[in-house]
C-alpha cells in the first residue's frame, strides 16, 4: 500500500486503511505518480482541485491507463476516461467542535480576500477588499489574509476568527464548476 496525498496527513490515511495494507495498491489524492515505482497493481487517483490550479485533470486524461479508478467531479475527465467515476466535491476545513459550538454572531459582514491572485474569483475578492470603504451601511471585518494557509490547523483557527462572530460573510469561489465547491462557501455558515 502506497499513499500519496497533498491535502491530508498520509499517516492518518495509512492508519484508516491498515486493514487492507496487504493489498498492492497506490492511492493518489491530489498527487501524481512521479516514477513507475510509485505505481502498484491497483492505482486510484482522486482529483479534487480544478484543472486551473495544477493541470492534474489534463494529466489524468493523458495518463488514464495508469489507473484502475479515477474519482473526480471534473466533467472533462468523466467524459474522456472510462475508468472515472463522479464524486461531487464540497467540504469544510472546520472540525466538528468548531462548527457545532455556539458562536456569538454580531450584525456585521466578514470577507476574507486571501493572498493568491491567479483566478477570476480571486481577482473579485481583491476588488472587494480594495473597495471596502464603499460599504458603509453595515459593520464589517475584512481580512487580506488569515495566516499560513499551508498549516491546516492554523488555517482553521484563522478562519474561525474571520467568520465566527459575523452574521454575514462574502464567499467568492476561485472557479465555477458543476459538481464542485470549496470550503469558502461553508466557511460563511460557521
Show the residue positions of the predicted features:
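Nucleotide-sugar donor-binding catalytic core of glycosyltransferases
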Residues: 1-190
Amino acid at each position: 500500500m502506497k499513499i500519496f496525498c497533498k491535502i491530508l496527513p498520509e499517516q492518518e490515511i495509512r492508519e484508516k486503511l491498515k486493514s487492507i495494507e496487504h493489498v498492492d495498491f497506490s492511492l493518489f489524492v491530489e498527487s501524481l505518480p512521479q516514477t513507475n515505482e510509485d505505481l502498484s497493481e491497483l492505482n486510484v487517483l482522486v482529483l479534487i482541485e480544478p484543472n486551473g490550479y495544477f493541470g492534474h485533470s489534463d494529466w489524468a486524461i493523458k495518463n488514464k491507463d495508469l489507473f484502475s479508478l479515477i474519482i473526480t467531479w471534473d466533467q472533462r475527465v468523466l467524459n474522456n476516461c472510462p475508468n472515472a467515476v463522479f464524486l461531487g466535491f464540497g467540504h469544510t476545513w472546520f472540525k466538528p467542535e468548531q462548527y457545532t459550538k455556539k458562536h456569538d454572531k454580531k450584525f456585521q459582514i466578514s470577507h476574507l480576500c486571501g493572498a493568491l491572485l491567479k483566478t477570476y474569483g480571486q481577482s473579485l475578492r481583491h476588488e472587494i477588499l480594495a473597495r471596502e470603504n464603499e460599504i458603509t451601511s453595515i459593520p464589517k471585518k475584512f481580512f487580506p489574509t488569515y495566516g499560513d494557509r499551508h498549516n491546516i490547523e492554523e488555517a482553521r483557527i484563522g478562519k474561525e476568527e474571520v467568520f465566527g462572530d459575523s452574521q454575514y460573510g462574502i464567499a467568492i469561489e476561485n472557479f465555477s464548476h458543476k459538481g464542485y465547491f470549496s470550503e469558502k462557501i461553508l466557511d460563511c455558515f460557521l
